[in-house]
């Protein structure tokens, strides 16, 4: 399995250019946070990595490398990169139970799909009464439960990399804390490389090792999390950090 995945000069376009020459490097055992406002190109960059661009959007430049060798997105999806989606309710087939979703995921990747394996993954993400959970349909579960189920399926994939696209969006504070605890636990136990897409600098401060800031389809600043919080350079980065510090009655040093 690769130890590093690199996005090199990725450019995306629809009727007009959307993402301009984005380069990112994911490394095993490290969390790279991709931050920026809505419409900055974060989710499109993830979609390009996985080969699931929306209709009408095409990649016009750039490549993806695994340990320095060019690779297609379809060769990464699932086997090498697991995904935790922004809106878990839309990610599940409403006609299938959690058992069917989990089992089909495992079988598609050639992983064990016995009930003991599925139960262990569900228990690992803190969902009580795994036997009951496996019988549930998506509409019978809360947003927090579905997000934890998404994480359980990412665990089942045993992929060396994870893309987590706004994993705490639209969840209440308690559910958000539980999701962050789970992601932190996965990093400690499995040490994947993680691309964490978020607009929440509190999430960045807690989980990230490195940060890339996007604005208008471009990476405007990159660095380790400590440097970015203590000495942000770009105006967008300074605005994000200042807004985060203001929540605690603090100000960014001039």
Curated annotation (Swiss-Prot):
Q: Which GO terms describe its cellular component?
A: plasma membrane
Q: Which residues form the signal peptide?
A: none
The cellular location(s) given in this protein's UniProt record come to: Cell inner membrane
Q: What is its EC number?
A: 7.2.2.11
What reaction gets catalysed by this protein?
Ni(2+)(out) + ATP + H2O = Ni(2+)(in) + ADP + phosphate + H(+)
Q: Which UniProt keywords apply?
A: ATP-binding, Cell inner membrane, Cell membrane, Ion transport, Membrane, Nickel, Nickel transport, Nucleotide-binding, Translocase, Transport
Residues holding ATP: 36-43
Q: Does the keyword Nucleotide-binding apply?
A: yes
Report the enzyme's class at the first EC level.
translocase
Membrane topology classification: Peripheral membrane protein
Where do the ABC transporter domain residues begin and end?
Answer: 2-241
InterPro entries per the UniProt record, alphabetical: AAA+_ATPase (IPR003593), ABC_Ni/Peptide_Import (IPR050388), ABC_transporter-like_ATP-bd (IPR003439), ABC_transporter-like_CS (IPR017871), Nickel_NikD (IPR014138), P-loop_NTPase (IPR027417)
Name one molecular function that GO assigns to this entry.
Answer: nickel cation binding
Q: What does this protein do?
A: Part of the ABC transporter complex NikABCDE involved in nickel import. Responsible for energy coupling to the transport system.
Descriptive protein name: Nickel import ATP-binding protein NikD
Name the encoding gene, please: nikD
């Amino acid at each position: 399995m690769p130890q590093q995945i690199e996005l090199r000069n990725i450019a995306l376009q629809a009727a007009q250019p959307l993402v301009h020459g984005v380069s990112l490097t994911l490394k095993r055992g490290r969390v790279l946070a991709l931050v920026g406002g809505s419409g900055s190109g974060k989710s499109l960059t993830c979609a390009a990595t996985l080969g699931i661009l929306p209709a009408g959007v095409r990649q016009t430049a750039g490549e993806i490398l695994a340990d320095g060798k060019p690779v297609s997105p379809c060769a990464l999806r699932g086997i090498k990169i697991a995904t935790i989606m922004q809106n878990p309710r839309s990610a599940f087939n409403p006609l299938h139970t959690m058992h069917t979703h989990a089992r089909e995921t495992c079988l598609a990747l050639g992983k064990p799909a016995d009930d003991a394996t599925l139960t262990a993954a569900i228990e690992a993400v803190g969902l009580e009464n795994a036997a009951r959970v496996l019988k549930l349909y998506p509409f019978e579960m809360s947003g927090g439960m579905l997000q934890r189920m998404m994480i359980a399926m990412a665990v089942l994939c045993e992929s060396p990399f994870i893309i987590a696209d706004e994993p705490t969006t639209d969840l209440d504070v308690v559910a958000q804390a539980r999701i962050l605890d789970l992601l932190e636990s996965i990093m400690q136990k499995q040490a994947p490389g993680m691309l964490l897409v978020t607009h929440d600098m509190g999430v960045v401060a807690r989980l990230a090792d490195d940060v890339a800031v996007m604005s208008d389809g471009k990476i405007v600043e990159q660095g380790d999390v400590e440097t970015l919080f203590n000495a942000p350079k770009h105006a967008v980065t300074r605005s994000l950090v200042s807004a985060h510090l203001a929540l605690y009655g603090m100000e960014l040093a001039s």
